[in-house]
Amino acid sequence: GNKQSPVDIKSSEVKHDTSLKPFSVSYNPASAKEIINVGHSFHVNFEDDSQSVLKGGPLSDNYRLSQFHFHWGKTDDYGSEHTVDGAKFSAELHLVHWNSGKYPNIADSVSKADGLAIVAVFLKVGQANPKLQKVLDALSAVKTKGKKASFTNFDPSTLLPPSLDYWTYSGSLTHPPLHESVTWLICKDSISISSEQLAQFRSLLSNAEGEAAVPILHNNRPPQPLKGRTVKASF
């Protein structure tokens, strides 16, 4: 495809777009539903209700939060998917939303050009981040593929950086089926995670219970060619 993700954001080629508005999120902590080990990562899934919404920025419709997940790597210095001027980050958070203004459900929107919007946040190894603790504490309940556990009363906007300056471009899911249906909003500022916290991601297993243990050491896709696309900056 010609619109694959992730990409390397080259600041010298980014276009500052004065028409880009800030984006806003409003998440209902009670909408958080469950945490599940999907074999290549874990997802925190949200109830399908209109309580948790992303709007503004480059988007012309309201987008509803479906789930969030992380990408990480074998080492602390490279676990992100997107890179900035070639610089890598320790991990990357993806908050996945679907276009509820236009489509009836996420299954219908996942293959549409304007179907999904993903907010990405870089994590940089450093201080332990107490805001990640509730998520990390839940991982022991979903050690193996297919396991799920209740996970509620959590507002993922607490994981966003203080500044919501962002880059945006048209791209794809970074895991099969790789649909080219994503408007990406990538926060310029990162949040912190400690080396010990990162290690907890890698302790998750990609195998089902009772099978030989295979840890999920990395699940980050390398940057893909831009192929003529423009990355715009809100700042």
Curated annotation (Swiss-Prot):
What is the annotated role of this protein in its UniProt record?
Answer: Catalyzes the reversible hydration of carbon dioxide. Can hydrate cyanamide to urea.
Q: Which organism was this protein described from? A: Oryctolagus cuniculus
Please name the InterPro entries in this protein's record.
CA_dom, CA_dom_sf, Carbonic_anhydrase_a-class, Carbonic_anhydrase_a-class_CS
Q: Active site: which residues?
A: H40 (proton donor/acceptor)
| Gene name linked to the record | CA1
Q: PANTHER family given for it?
A: CARBONIC ANHYDRASE, CARBONIC ANHYDRASE 1
Q: Which GO terms describe its molecular function?
A: carbonate dehydratase activity; cyanamide hydratase activity; zinc ion binding
Asked whether the UniProt record includes Ion transport among its keywords, one would answer no
* GO CC annotation, single: cytoplasm
What is the protein named? Carbonic anhydrase 1
Localization, per the record, is: Cytoplasm
Domain Alpha-carbonic anhydrase as annotated: residue spans: 1-235
Instruction: Name the residues that bind Zn(2+).
Output: H69, H71, H94
Q: Which Pfam families match?
A: Carb_anhydrase
